[in-house]
UniProtKB/Swiss-Prot annotation:
It is found in: Cell membrane. This is ABC transporter ATP-binding protein YtrE. SUPFAM superfamilies: P-loop containing nucleoside triphosphate hydrolases. It holds the Pfam family ABC_tran.
Protein backbone atom coordinates (compact mmCIF):
# COMPACT_ATOMS: atom_id res chain seq x y z
CA UNK A 1 0.00 0.00 0.00
CA UNK A 2 2.65 2.55 1.09
CA UNK A 3 6.32 1.75 0.60
CA UNK A 4 8.91 4.39 1.47
CA UNK A 5 12.40 3.31 0.43
CA UNK A 6 15.59 4.92 1.79
CA UNK A 7 14.25 8.47 1.75
CA UNK A 8 16.44 11.48 2.48
CA UNK A 9 15.11 15.01 2.59
CA UNK A 10 16.98 18.27 3.15
CA UNK A 11 16.07 21.94 3.18
CA UNK A 12 18.31 24.57 1.66
CA UNK A 13 18.95 27.69 3.72
CA UNK A 14 21.15 30.74 3.22
CA UNK A 15 21.74 33.21 0.43
CA UNK A 16 22.61 32.20 -3.12
CA UNK A 17 26.19 31.08 -3.31
CA UNK A 18 26.27 30.41 0.43
CA UNK A 19 23.54 27.81 0.72
CA UNK A 20 23.61 25.12 3.35
CA UNK A 21 21.76 21.83 3.23
CA UNK A 22 19.93 21.01 6.46
CA UNK A 23 19.00 17.31 6.66
CA UNK A 24 15.48 16.62 7.94
CA UNK A 25 15.03 12.92 7.14
CA UNK A 26 17.89 10.44 6.89
CA UNK A 27 17.58 7.10 5.09
CA UNK A 28 13.97 6.54 6.16
CA UNK A 29 12.24 3.34 5.05
CA UNK A 30 8.81 2.11 6.11
CA UNK A 31 5.98 -0.02 4.79
CA UNK A 32 2.31 0.34 5.65
CA UNK A 33 -0.01 -2.49 4.63
CA UNK A 34 -3.51 -2.12 3.20
CA UNK A 35 -6.07 -1.64 5.97
CA UNK A 36 -3.48 -0.82 8.61
CA UNK A 37 -3.48 2.05 11.09
CA UNK A 38 0.13 3.23 11.25
CA UNK A 39 1.19 5.88 13.76
CA UNK A 40 4.33 7.95 13.30
CA UNK A 41 5.43 9.24 16.68
CA UNK A 42 8.02 11.84 17.62
CA UNK A 43 8.64 15.18 19.21
CA UNK A 44 8.14 18.48 17.40
CA UNK A 45 10.91 18.92 14.84
CA UNK A 46 11.60 15.20 14.50
CA UNK A 47 10.51 15.12 10.84
CA UNK A 48 6.97 13.71 11.19
CA UNK A 49 5.20 16.37 9.13
CA UNK A 50 7.95 16.31 6.52
CA UNK A 51 7.46 12.57 6.07
CA UNK A 52 3.70 13.02 5.69
CA UNK A 53 4.27 15.77 3.11
CA UNK A 54 6.58 13.46 1.17
CA UNK A 55 4.04 10.63 1.16
CA UNK A 56 1.34 13.02 -0.09
CA UNK A 57 3.56 14.65 -2.72
CA UNK A 58 3.62 18.21 -1.41
CA UNK A 59 7.42 18.04 -1.29
CA UNK A 60 9.89 15.76 -3.09
CA UNK A 61 12.58 13.56 -1.57
CA UNK A 62 16.22 14.49 -1.96
CA UNK A 63 16.93 10.79 -2.38
CA UNK A 64 14.94 7.57 -2.33
CA UNK A 65 11.71 6.15 -3.71
CA UNK A 66 8.02 6.17 -2.75
CA UNK A 67 5.52 3.60 -4.04
CA UNK A 68 1.81 3.96 -3.23
CA UNK A 69 -0.86 1.45 -4.25
CA UNK A 70 1.66 -0.12 -6.62
CA UNK A 71 2.52 3.17 -8.35
CA UNK A 72 5.98 4.73 -8.16
CA UNK A 73 5.10 8.35 -7.42
CA UNK A 74 8.65 9.60 -6.85
CA UNK A 75 8.92 11.51 -10.12
CA UNK A 76 5.36 12.82 -10.35
CA UNK A 77 4.86 16.43 -11.41
CA UNK A 78 2.34 18.73 -9.67
CA UNK A 79 -0.52 17.89 -12.05
CA UNK A 80 0.02 14.15 -11.65
CA UNK A 81 0.20 14.50 -7.87
CA UNK A 82 -3.01 16.58 -7.74
CA UNK A 83 -4.94 13.86 -9.57
CA UNK A 84 -3.33 11.07 -7.53
CA UNK A 85 -4.25 12.77 -4.26
CA UNK A 86 -7.84 13.22 -5.42
CA UNK A 87 -8.07 9.54 -6.39
CA UNK A 88 -6.31 7.93 -3.42
CA UNK A 89 -6.03 10.23 -0.37
CA UNK A 90 -8.16 11.90 2.24
CA UNK A 91 -6.69 14.36 4.75
CA UNK A 92 -7.47 15.18 8.38
CA UNK A 93 -5.79 18.15 10.06
CA UNK A 94 -5.34 19.34 13.63
CA UNK A 95 -6.85 22.73 12.74
CA UNK A 96 -9.78 21.12 10.83
CA UNK A 97 -9.19 23.29 7.70
CA UNK A 98 -12.90 23.86 7.14
CA UNK A 99 -14.05 26.73 4.93
CA UNK A 100 -15.74 29.24 7.31
CA UNK A 101 -18.27 30.52 4.77
CA UNK A 102 -19.56 27.06 3.89
CA UNK A 103 -22.01 24.94 5.87
CA UNK A 104 -21.25 21.46 7.15
CA UNK A 105 -23.00 20.04 4.09
CA UNK A 106 -21.08 22.27 1.68
CA UNK A 107 -17.69 21.54 3.27
CA UNK A 108 -18.27 17.80 2.91
CA UNK A 109 -19.63 18.23 -0.62
CA UNK A 110 -16.60 20.21 -1.85
CA UNK A 111 -14.37 17.25 -2.92
CA UNK A 112 -17.27 15.80 -4.92
CA UNK A 113 -17.72 19.11 -6.72
CA UNK A 114 -13.99 19.34 -7.42
CA UNK A 115 -14.09 15.89 -8.98
CA UNK A 116 -16.95 16.95 -11.26
CA UNK A 117 -19.65 14.75 -9.77
CA UNK A 118 -23.15 15.95 -10.66
CA UNK A 119 -25.15 17.76 -7.94
CA UNK A 120 -27.92 15.18 -8.22
CA UNK A 121 -25.44 12.43 -7.31
CA UNK A 122 -23.74 14.43 -4.57
CA UNK A 123 -26.75 14.92 -2.31
CA UNK A 124 -27.22 11.30 -1.23
CA UNK A 125 -23.49 10.76 -0.78
CA UNK A 126 -23.19 13.76 1.54
CA UNK A 127 -26.32 12.88 3.51
CA UNK A 128 -25.11 9.30 4.01
CA UNK A 129 -21.67 10.46 5.13
CA UNK A 130 -23.04 13.02 7.59
CA UNK A 131 -25.25 10.33 9.08
CA UNK A 132 -22.25 8.02 9.42
CA UNK A 133 -20.30 10.56 11.48
CA UNK A 134 -23.34 11.59 13.53
CA UNK A 135 -23.86 15.05 12.02
CA UNK A 136 -27.06 14.57 10.02
CA UNK A 137 -28.75 17.22 12.19
CA UNK A 138 -25.96 19.76 11.68
CA UNK A 139 -25.88 19.93 7.87
CA UNK A 140 -26.88 23.62 7.77
CA UNK A 141 -24.50 24.72 10.53
CA UNK A 142 -21.37 26.76 9.84
CA UNK A 143 -18.02 25.80 11.40
CA UNK A 144 -18.23 28.52 14.07
CA UNK A 145 -21.54 27.03 15.21
CA UNK A 146 -19.95 23.64 15.91
CA UNK A 147 -17.83 22.31 18.78
CA UNK A 148 -14.25 21.24 18.15
CA UNK A 149 -15.24 17.59 18.09
CA UNK A 150 -18.04 18.28 15.62
CA UNK A 151 -15.70 20.25 13.37
CA UNK A 152 -13.26 17.34 13.34
CA UNK A 153 -16.11 15.00 12.42
CA UNK A 154 -16.89 17.30 9.47
CA UNK A 155 -13.22 17.09 8.52
CA UNK A 156 -13.33 13.29 8.72
CA UNK A 157 -16.52 13.17 6.62
CA UNK A 158 -14.91 15.39 4.00
CA UNK A 159 -11.81 13.17 3.97
CA UNK A 160 -13.96 10.07 3.40
CA UNK A 161 -16.45 11.40 0.86
CA UNK A 162 -14.48 10.24 -2.22
CA UNK A 163 -13.88 6.78 -0.71
CA UNK A 164 -10.08 7.10 -0.53
CA UNK A 165 -7.96 4.05 0.16
CA UNK A 166 -5.64 6.09 2.41
CA UNK A 167 -6.28 8.75 5.06
CA UNK A 168 -3.34 10.90 6.15
CA UNK A 169 -3.94 12.52 9.53
CA UNK A 170 -1.74 15.27 10.99
CA UNK A 171 -2.25 15.47 14.79
CA UNK A 172 -5.99 14.79 14.32
CA UNK A 173 -6.86 15.25 18.01
CA UNK A 174 -4.36 17.98 18.86
CA UNK A 175 -7.06 20.64 19.29
CA UNK A 176 -9.49 18.47 21.25
CA UNK A 177 -10.10 17.76 24.93
CA UNK A 178 -9.48 14.22 26.20
CA UNK A 179 -13.12 13.09 26.07
CA UNK A 180 -13.62 14.35 22.52
CA UNK A 181 -10.25 12.89 21.51
CA UNK A 182 -11.45 9.47 22.66
CA UNK A 183 -14.65 9.81 20.59
CA UNK A 184 -12.71 10.78 17.45
CA UNK A 185 -10.24 7.91 17.90
CA UNK A 186 -13.14 5.47 18.28
CA UNK A 187 -14.62 6.80 15.02
CA UNK A 188 -11.28 6.33 13.21
CA UNK A 189 -11.05 2.73 14.45
CA UNK A 190 -14.64 2.01 13.39
CA UNK A 191 -14.04 3.40 9.90
CA UNK A 192 -10.85 1.38 9.60
CA UNK A 193 -12.70 -1.83 10.49
CA UNK A 194 -15.78 -1.12 8.37
CA UNK A 195 -14.12 0.19 5.22
CA UNK A 196 -10.58 -1.22 5.35
CA UNK A 197 -9.14 2.27 4.97
CA UNK A 198 -5.42 2.66 5.61
CA UNK A 199 -4.65 5.41 8.13
CA UNK A 200 -1.27 7.08 8.57
CA UNK A 201 -1.39 9.26 11.68
CA UNK A 202 1.37 11.53 12.93
CA UNK A 203 1.24 12.37 16.60
CA UNK A 204 3.19 13.03 19.77
CA UNK A 205 0.27 11.75 21.86
CA UNK A 206 0.59 8.24 23.35
CA UNK A 207 -3.21 7.90 23.51
CA UNK A 208 -3.46 8.44 19.76
CA UNK A 209 -0.53 6.11 19.06
CA UNK A 210 -2.23 3.36 21.07
CA UNK A 211 -4.81 2.75 18.32
CA UNK A 212 -2.15 1.91 15.73
CA UNK A 213 -1.50 -1.58 14.40
CA UNK A 214 2.08 -0.41 13.98
CA UNK A 215 4.08 2.45 15.42
CA UNK A 216 7.11 4.18 13.90
CA UNK A 217 9.36 6.34 16.05
CA UNK A 218 11.11 9.32 14.45
CA UNK A 219 13.98 10.97 16.29
CA UNK A 220 15.97 13.77 14.67
CA UNK A 221 15.03 12.55 11.20
CA UNK A 222 15.96 8.92 11.84
CA UNK A 223 13.31 6.21 11.90
CA UNK A 224 13.84 3.94 14.87
CA UNK A 225 11.85 1.08 13.38
CA UNK A 226 8.29 -0.13 13.13
CA UNK A 227 6.77 -1.71 16.22
CA UNK A 228 3.70 -3.90 15.88
CA UNK A 229 1.30 -3.26 18.74
CA UNK A 230 -1.81 -5.04 19.98
CA UNK A 231 -5.02 -3.02 19.59
Amino acid sequence: MIDVQHIDHSFTIGKKGRENEVPVLKDVSLSVAKGEIACIVGRSGSGKSTLLNLISGYISPTKGRIVINGTDVTGFNEKEWAQFRLDHFGFIFQSFQLIPGLTTYENVEMPLALKGIKPSERKQKVQDMLKRVGLENHAAHYPNELSGGQQQRVSIARALILNPSIILADEPTGSLDSETEHEVLELIQQLNRERGITFVIITHDDEVASIGHSKFQLHDGVLKGGITVEV
